[in-house]
Amino acid sequence: FFLIADYQALGDHLNDIDLIRDSVLQVTLDWLAVGLDPEKSAFVIQSYVPEFAELTMLLSFITPLGMLERNPTLKGELADLDIERRSVGFFNYPMSQVADILLPQAHLVPVGDDQLPHVEMTREVARKFNRMFANVFPEPDSLVGRVPRLSGTDGQGKMSKSKGNVIMLSDDEKAVTKKVRSMFTDPNRIRADIPGKVEGNPVFQYHDAFNPNTAQIDDFKARYREGNIGDVEIKMALAEAINTFLDPIRERRAYYESNMSLVEEAIMDGVARMRVIAAETMKQVRDAMRISSYTKNWK
């Protein structure tokens, strides 16, 4: 299951619904462009499945406030948010993320390493529900990729569209090259003959992720540490590698942009499949909590 969490996007984009609407389309196009098969993977818009909201509400009653307050992602985002925009809905979005995982009864969740605490929180909530009521939810495991997180192109935290430090899957060759040329490197290396730091350097992080030529990467790293290579050579090789990686993605994206009925079909089919599973999960939840049949014996 691949989820577009549009409810959660309301937390900091409530006054820009058009942005959310466009993002739903762009994310779906990205999924199709990278080769996800909608017959094997269900694409789901969160608000199209009301059981997500219901499960969020029910699980919030068994979740201590302190568990949300300890969530590192929430703490960081609250610090960056004006106090007037700190809504109850925004504060509760980690609970919504828990429901995102538990409603389809997921066993494995692909995440970046910054989301590991969230999956652990989901496991805690699942354990507590199962202990209090009935064994309904599996405890999901995390799946972290070979590159657990990509830094932003400016070296400031992870990629963020709002911060403008991101390379989009839809970027053309010229845009990618421009962004790569301006990427943050080692700030202490002001000349090509000064030894540089590879560790934590976004340019090398991206090489590791997108450049299949490992011999070239090893050569670049060795020469960079020795002060025998300039940033421009490394960045131009990276731009070429990323553009080569993106070429088939751009081609598939153009196809789906010309066949929007297939995009809508992918979403609606995924939502329909999710609704079947969601209904069964919520029946188990309501039965376990004994809130599904108040009037059963009213005779």
Give the label of every model feature segment.
Residues F1-A99, A254:
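N-terminal Rossmann-like or analogous alpha/beta NTP/dinucleotide-binding catalytic cores
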Residues L10-H13, L103-H107, K158-M159:
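Active-site-proximal beta-alpha loop/turn segments in soluble metabolic enzymes
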Residues D18-L25, L116-V119, E264:
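Non-membrane alpha-helical structural segments and their capping/turn regions in soluble enzymes
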Residues T28, G35, T63-M67, A106, ...:
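A generic secondary-structure signal for well-formed alpha-helical elements
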Residues L65-E69, L103-P110, N211-F220, R250:
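Short helix-capping/linker segments at secondary-structure and domain boundaries
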Residues T73-G76, D80-V125, F129, F133, ...:
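Internal, conserved structured core segments that host functional sites
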Residues P117, R123-K299:
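Conserved nucleotide- and phosphate/pyrophosphate-binding catalytic cores
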